[in-house]
């Protein structure tokens, strides 16, 4: 019964209160900062795309060029197995298998092949133009072919090239020119044949000591065949060596040869340039569209970063090696502590956030004779929202120099360069990834500090208004020394609290209670004092009862003196 009286006493003593706090929810989102790991926040935004659809798709409505079982060389030279590629429309990117079967059917090499593929990565359409028609080589045989490039079981040759051999027993000097009047730059490919022995040389070209000369305003190349015995490839001991150049507008290319010339019948006008690329993959085009393509699959996202593949084509996020990039946009999420104790106190911002406040990030909880409730502080919440709205864009702007992995290729003789290039690219990507991760950590630290600062500013705003008309309870709450109805509470919230109006009432109520001061003593200390007093009183009553009983039965003599 005494405890009930004590609780009622404490309840009666408790004054009106206003608390400053912040929003919390059931979110389990976690972010990292410079100083902390796995900080639970109310709101966060994942800015790293980790998924793709596993498909090769049209890019912005334009299909890629599927080389199927052909290589770039097989396509450009016109391998008979690649006839489907003789005429191709505009492409968005090129799909080439890792090891296509149909390349140089007649064995040999392609000079600066990797550089050519790099050039093609910036082209989205070739227009094939006949530059040196085969029927104009009237003094030479133009039907040269090989079983290595068989077509329907018979010997054939690259469709876009002309293998010039002797006519009868003569091979007069072959001289032809082409002037580029197409209005665009043009890719020109030619070759030289290296026979297996001198008898093959005479059988094909009659002449020995031959040469092939090619010249433009910027090129002067003269080559001679290297006659040597070699192991047979595709049944051939000879080799063909192909070269290429870009012929500028109005420039002229001149060919001159006394034998062994593989002449171009067609050139490739670069009719459209764009951000293309060569995807090394075994995949095939599927019925889908995307704005961003990788060799592994298409990415459809609005996020600023991805970790899928360094080689991308289209409007793509920036590539990083990170496994996780989460940007904090909300506050630290500390669920409200529902520990009401003897007073039914509402936890303030020190103890935890409020799930009951749903219309803002920061705000108030008040309790008085008219009731209690939450109210968000619209002004501070809106300022915070404005400050964080463009945070993702800010991160992107700070990382606006994308490191591009262009998928360079190297020949077998350039392995050291390839390894060095790979190490450099890996190093750049490591630095790029570190910068992105560090930027996110710093932004998260700033965001959480920003929210903490806003809560503190709101607290200070209330404290400066109330001054000594209320006492700070140490948990984000103030207890008034005067009665504060709803109108009074609203004036505190909107910053129009009239200190002088309540000053006298507060002075009267600030008189400290002598003995036990509730303002600085905990519940357990109060209960301990109560228990001590109650125990002493019970002991005194017990001793008095025993004494009266002993006096009544004669065990104790009692004398009352007046």
UniProtKB/Swiss-Prot annotation:
Provide the transmembrane region boundaries: 526-546
Q: What keywords does the record list, in alphabetical order?
A: Clathrin- and caveolin-independent endocytosis of virus by host, Clathrin-mediated endocytosis of virus by host, Disulfide bond, Fusion of virus membrane with host endosomal membrane, Fusion of virus membrane with host membrane, Glycoprotein, Hemagglutinin, Host cell membrane, Host membrane, Host-virus interaction, Lipoprotein, Membrane, Palmitate, Signal, Transmembrane, Transmembrane helix, Viral attachment to host cell, Viral envelope protein, Viral penetration into host cytoplasm, Virion, Virus endocytosis by host, Virus entry into host cell
List the GO biological process terms: clathrin-dependent endocytosis of virus by host cell; fusion of virus membrane with host endosome membrane; fusion of virus membrane with host plasma membrane; viral budding from plasma membrane; virion attachment to host cell
Q: Where is the lipid attached (S-palmitoyl cysteine)?
A: 551, 558, 561
Q: Could you name the Gene Ontology cellular component terms for this entry?
A: host cell plasma membrane; membrane; viral envelope; virion membrane
Q: Localized where?
A: Virion membrane; Host apical cell membrane
Q: Which residues lie on this side of the membrane: Extracellular?
A: 16-525
Entry-linked InterPro entries: Capsid_hemagglutn, Hemagglutn_HA1_a/b_dom_sf, Hemagglutn_influenz_A, Hemagglutn_influenz_A/B
Give the intrachain disulfide bonds.
Answer: 19-477, 57-288, 70-82, 105-149, 292-316, 484-488
Q: Which domain of life is it from?
A: Viruses
Span of the signal peptide: 1-15
The annotated topology with respect to the bilayer is: Single-pass type I membrane protein
The protein's site described by Cleavage is found at 340-341
The protein's recorded glycosylation sites are 25-26, 38, 179-180, 300, 494, 509
Q: Cross-referenced HAMAP family, in alphabetical order?
A: INFV_HEMA
Q: What family is it from?
A: Belongs to the influenza viruses hemagglutinin family.
* Additional notes on this entry: Major glycoprotein, comprises over 80% of the envelope proteins present in virus particle. The extent of infection into host organism is determined by HA. Influenza viruses bud from the apical surface of polarized epithelial cells (e.g. bronchial epithelial cells) into lumen of lungs and are therefore usually pneumotropic. The reason is that HA is cleaved by tryptase clara which is restricted to lungs. However, HAs of H5 and H7 pantropic avian viruses subtypes can be cleaved by furin and subtilisin-type enzymes, allowing the virus to grow in other organs than lungs.
What is this protein for, i.e. what is its function? Answer: Binds to sialic acid-containing receptors on the cell surface, bringing about the attachment of the virus particle to the cell. This attachment induces virion internalization either through clathrin-dependent endocytosis or through clathrin- and caveolin-independent pathway. Plays a major role in the determination of host range restriction and virulence. Class I viral fusion protein. Responsible for penetration of the virus into the cell cytoplasm by mediating the fusion of the membrane of the endocytosed virus particle with the endosomal membrane.
Q: Please state what the protein is called.
A: Hemagglutinin
Q: Where does this protein come from, organism-wise?
A: Influenza A virus (strain A/Herring gull/DE/677/1988 H2N8)
Q: From which lineage does this chain's organism come?
A: Viruses, Riboviria, Orthornavirae, Negarnaviricota, Polyploviricotina
State which gene encodes it. Answer: HA
């Amino acid at each position: 019964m005494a405890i009930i009286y004590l609780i009622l006493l404490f309840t009666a003593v408790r004054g009106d209160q206003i608390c400053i706090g912040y929003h919390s929810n059931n979110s389990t989102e976690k972010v990292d900062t410079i100083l902390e790991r796995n900080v639970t926040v109310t709101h966060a935004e994942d800015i790293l795309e980790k998924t793709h659809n596993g498909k090769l798709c049209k890019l912005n409505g334009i299909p890629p060029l599927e080389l199927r079982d052909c290589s770039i060389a097989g396509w450009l030279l016109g391998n008979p197995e690649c006839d489907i590629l003789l005429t191709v429309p505009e492409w968005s990117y090129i799909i080439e298998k890792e090891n296509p079967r149909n390349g140089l059917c007649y064995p040999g090499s392609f000079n600066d092949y990797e550089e050519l593929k790099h050039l093609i990565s910036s082209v989205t359409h070739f227009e094939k133009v006949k530059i040196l028609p085969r029927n104009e080589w009237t003094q030479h045989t133009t039907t040269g072919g090989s079983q290595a490039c068989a077509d329907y079981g018979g010997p054939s040759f690259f469709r876009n090239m002309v293998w010039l051999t002797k006519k009868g027993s003569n091979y007069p000097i072959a001289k032809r020119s082409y002037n580029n009047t197409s209005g665009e730059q043009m890719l020109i490919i030619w070759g030289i044949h290296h026979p297996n022995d001198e008898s093959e040389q005479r059988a094909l070209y009659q002449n020995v000591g031959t040469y092939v000369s090619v010249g433009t305003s910027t090129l002067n190349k003269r080559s001679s065949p290297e006659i040597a015995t070699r192991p047979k490839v595709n049944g051939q001991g000879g080799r063909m060596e192909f070269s290429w150049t870009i012929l500028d507008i109005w420039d002229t290319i001149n060919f001159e040869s006394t034998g062994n010339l593989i002449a171009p019948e067609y050139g490739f006008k670069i009719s459209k340039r764009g951000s293309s690329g060569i995807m090394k993959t075994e995949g095939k085009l599927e019925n889908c569209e995307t704005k961003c393509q990788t060799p592994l699959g298409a990415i459809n996202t609005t996020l600023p970063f991805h970790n899928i593949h360094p080689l991308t084509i289209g409007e793509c996020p920036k590539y990083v090696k990170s496994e996780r990039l989460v940007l904090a946009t909300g506050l630290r999420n500390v669920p409200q502590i529902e520990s009401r104790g003897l007073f039914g106190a509402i936890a303030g911002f020190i103890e935890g956030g409020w799930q009951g406040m749903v219309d803002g990030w920061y705000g108030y909880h008040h309790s008085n004779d008219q009731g209690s409730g939450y109210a968000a502080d619209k002004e501070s919440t809106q300022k915070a929202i404005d400050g964080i709205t463009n945070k993702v864009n800010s991160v992107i702007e700070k990382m606006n120099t994308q490191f591009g992995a262009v998928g360079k290729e190297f020949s077998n003789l350039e392995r050291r360069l390839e390894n060095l290039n790979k190490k450099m690219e890996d190093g750049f990507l490591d630095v790029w990834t570190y910068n992105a991760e560090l930027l996110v950590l710093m932004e998260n630290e700033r965001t959480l500090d920003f929210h903490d600062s806003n809560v503190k500013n709101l607290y200070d705003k209330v404290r400066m208004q109330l001054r000594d008309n209320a006492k700070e309870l140490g948990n984000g709450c103030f207890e008034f020394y005067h009665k504060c109805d709803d109108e009074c509470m609203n004036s505190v919230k909107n910053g129009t609290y009239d200190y002088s109006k309540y000053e006298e009432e507060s002075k009267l109520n600030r008189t400290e209670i002598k003995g036990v001061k509730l303002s600085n003593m905990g519940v357990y200390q109060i209960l301990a004092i109560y228990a001590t007093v109650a125990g002493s009183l019970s002991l005194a009553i017990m001793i008095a009862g025993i004494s009266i009983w002993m006096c009544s039965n004669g065990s104790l003599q009692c004398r009352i003196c007046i």
